[in-house]
Structure formats: C-alpha cells, structure tokens
Curated annotation (Swiss-Prot):
Cofactor binding note from Swiss-Prot or TrEMBL: Binds a second Mg(2+) ion via substrate during catalysis.
Sequence similarity: Belongs to the enolase family.
Subunit organization: Component of the RNA degradosome, a multiprotein complex involved in RNA processing and mRNA degradation.
Organism of this sequence: Pseudoalteromonas atlantica (strain T6c / ATCC BAA-1087)
Name of this protein: Enolase
Binding-site positions, Mg(2+): D246, E289, D316
General function of this protein: Catalyzes the reversible conversion of 2-phosphoglycerate (2-PG) into phosphoenolpyruvate (PEP). It is essential for the degradation of carbohydrates via glycolysis.
Catalytic residue positions: E209 (proton donor), K341 (proton acceptor)
Ligand binding ((2R)-2-phosphoglycerate): Q167, K341, R370, S371, K392
Domain of life of the organism encoding this protein: Bacteria
Gene that encodes the chain: eno
Annotated localization: Cytoplasm; Secreted; Cell surface
Length: 430
C-alpha cells in the first residue's frame, strides 16, 4: 500500500514572485505528500542546477515548465509502483535517470520536489510526523532536538537594495530555555529594532528574508543598531543573545580582492580574514557564514586557523551541501560547519548524507531556507529529525519565513519533554 500510484508536477509561485516547482505524490493507500522547491539569490557556482525555461516572453525567462514536464513525463513513469518507504532507492532512480553530475537534465528543482513529496507521503502512510520519519531515514530514530534559530533581522548584499555589503546580520537567542521562548525573544528584538531604525529616520522596509534593509554607513553600524535593539528589548548581549553573520563573500569577491563598496574598502584574503576576526573580537559574533569566497580555500584555511576554535565558520557557497566538497574541507581543516540547503544538492537522501558526514567529523550542520521560499515548512522537520541543533529561516515577518517557525512550535508541543533546546552549546566553538 506504500507504493507510488501517481505523481503530479506543477508550476507555482515563490515568495519573490518567481515560478517554482511543486510535486504531489500519491500512494496506493491514498496518502498524498506535497512539496515545493525553494530558490536562492546568492548561489554557489557548484550547486545542482535549477532548471529554468529561458523563455523571455514568460515570467522573464524564469518559468519552470521544463522541470514540471520532467516530473510528469520522465520521473513519474519511472517511480510508479516503487515503495515510498525506500527513499534511497526512489532518489537514486531519479538521479540515475537524470544521468548528469549536477542534475541539469531534469533540474534539481524537479528532483527535489518529488523527493520531499515522497518522504511526506511515506510519513502520512505510516501515520507518523515527518520529523519522525526523517529521523528513521537518517538512522537516528527517536533522537530529536529543537534548533537554535539564526534570525536574519538586517538584510544586505544580494538580499536587499541597500548599501550594506554583508548579506545577513542575525541574532541567536542562545539563552532561551526552549524554542518557544527563543522565538518570543527574536520577535521582541525584531520589533525593538524597527523602533530603533524609525527613531534614526532609517527605512523599515524589509528584504527577501523579512529582515530590515536600511542604508547604513557601515557593517559595524548594523551591528550597533542590533545591539541597541537587543538591549532595548530587555536582553543581555552574549548571555541571552549572540550575533551571527552571513558575509556571502563570493558576491563581492572581484579579481582576488574583497571589495566592500558600501564602505569604500578593498581587502585581500588575509586582511579580510583579519577584518572578520576583529569584528568577532569586538562584538559577540559566534558564527560567520561564507566569510571568504567559495574558491579561496587558502583564505578559508587561514581564517579557520585564526578563529575556528572560538567562532563557528559555516561553509555555504563553499560546500553547497555536497559530500565530495565537504570531505575536502574536513580533510584540509577548512571551516568547521556546513550550511544545509536541500536544493543545492537536489534530493533528501543526499542532504541526509551531507548532514551525517558533517556531524561524524565534528562539524555542525545548520539547516537553511533560501531567499526564494514558499509556505512549505519541510526544513523545520529536517532540523528536528536530524537533531541538527541550528536553523536559518529568516526574520519574524513574511509568512514564507514564519511558516517554518510555526511548524517548529507545533513540533515542540508534540514532543513535550523530548523537545530539548541546546542553546549556545549547539554552536561550534562554544
């Protein structure tokens, strides 16, 4: 009864008004799983391919009818009759059928939507929550934890139309006793920050991920207004709340230099590493993502030596959720954490393999959304089901972001005493 009986792919809209792929997977039992593929703005060059139509007369070339056709015409016939309980086999059939290294034939957006929908259908068929099914697939049945949220409350870089170079300034409510209270702290800080920015006559418009996107004189000014907001909300920096950055450095890495146009400063690899180390020493920054360009492996190794014992250094564009690249990082002392994005690799099985490899090597794994999202909240279940300990899913506004937080609230309620919240100890180097 767990066998796949029907698969439907369709084109829907994401949070940026661009098309994306949705898949429905039906089982013989009548269970149906539905999932969508997210989409990134700042992307790593080695990510699995997101297939777009390129037809400029339709959605500015961003349609996904080719990916949808791949689901309906190629993937569906190949998967019919297979058990949704055998996630690894289902994913491998799609990967083999595509036959390319980066899923460029069908598109990672097509394969991923089906992969996640299969998992959701299987969970429904087993009459268990998705996070429980994921923990069983992961070989860690019954091992759960609620993630520390990294809440992106000031957006810059590719996620906003402002002059701030660093892409994300985040707060982590590490001092909260549970996820519910962590979320409350984040929401109160978000509203406090709006008041701080308004009082300074700064814009309170939001970027793609729901964080504010004001024009500020420097990256340090962004840190200062966040600290003011945290304190105004009644919390203590470094005890209740810590800071995290996503530099997305590949976006301002030009000809071997790091060009911070918003500040009028240019750095080489070594001096930009020093700049980040100085920020982490001056402010309670305990996590830095993509501090250096995805190709600057020497710079990454140097930064890891400098501050990797006390700051979590997260590889996003660097590793693109790819076990081959992650292994190189582990073997060469590059970074100490990986950002996990389903659509960078394109299937649930490969995502779980990357999380396991990271955790086995003593790296942390941070589960992440993309800047182009939908109401699909699967990453919440992934974070809990793999006991990853950290999640990045934007700010405290925009329903595409809040959907994930709300799902985590539901999961925490369902788990009761089993819903442990690790706080600061979940972050590498703490």
């Amino acid at each position: 009864m767990s066998n796949i009986s029907k698969i439907i792919g369709r084109e829907i809209m994401d949070s940026r008004g661009n098309p994306t792929v949705e898949a429905d997977v039906y089982l013989e039992s009548g269970a149906m799983g539905r999932a969508t593929a997210p989409s990134g703005a700042s992307t790593g060059s080695r990510e699995a391919l997101e297939l777009r139509d390129g037809d400029k007369s339709r959605y500015l070339g961003k349609g996904v009818l080719k990916a949808v056709a791949a689901i309906n015409e190629d993937i569906a016939p190949a998967l019919l009759g297979n058990s949704a309980f055998d996630q690894k086999k289902v994913d491998q059939i799609m990967i083999d059928l595509d036959g390319t290294e980066n899923k460029e034939k069908f598109g990672a957006n097509a394969i991923l939507a089906v992969s996640l929908a299969v998992a959701k259908a299987a969970a429904l068929d087993k009459q268990i929550p998705l996070y429980q099914h994921i923990s069983e697939l992961n070989g860690t049945a019954g091992k759960y934890s609620m993630p520390v949220p990294m809440m992106n409350i000031i957006n810059g870089g590719e996620h906003a139309d402002n002059n701030v170079d660093i892409q994300e300034f985040m707060v982590q409510p590490v001092g909260a006793p549970n996820f519910r209270e962590a979320l409350r702290m984040g929401a109160e800080i978000f509203h406090s920050l709006k008041k701080v920015l308004s009082a300074k006559g700064l814009s309170t418009a939001v970027g793609d991920e729901g964080g504010f996107a004001p024009n500020l004189a420097s990256n340090e000014e962004a840190l200062k207004v966040i600290i003011q907001a945290v304190e105004n909300a009644g919390y203590e920096m470094n005890k209740d709340v810590t800071l995290a950055l996503d530099c997305a450095s590949s976006e301002f890495y030009v000809d071997g230099k790091y060009d911070l146009k918003g500040e009028g400063k240019v750095f080489d690899s070594e001096t930009f590493g020093d700049y980040l180390a100085d920020l982490a020493a001056k402010y309670p920054i305990i996590s830095i993502e993509d501090g250096l360009d995805e190709s600057d492996w020497d710079g990454w190794a140097s930064l890891t030596k400098k501050i990797g014992d006390k700051v979590q250094l997260v590889g996003d564009d660097l590793f693109v959720t790819n076990t081959k690249i992650l292994k190189r990082g582990i073997d060469n002392g590059v970074a100490n954490s990986i950002l996990i994005k389903f659509n960078q690799i394109g299937s649930l099985t490969e995502t779980l393999e990357a999380i396991r490899m990271a955790q086995d090597a003593g790296f942390t794994a941070v589960i992440s959304h993309r800047s182009g999202e939908t109401e699909d909240a699967t990453i919440a279940d992934l974070a809990v089901g793999t006991a990853a300990g950290q999640i990045k899913t934007g700010s405290l506004c925009r329903s595409d972001r809040v959907a994930k937080y709300n799902q985590l609230l539901r999961i925490e309620e369902a788990l009761g005493d089993a819903a442990t919240y690790g706080g600061r100890k979940e972050i590498k180097g703490q």
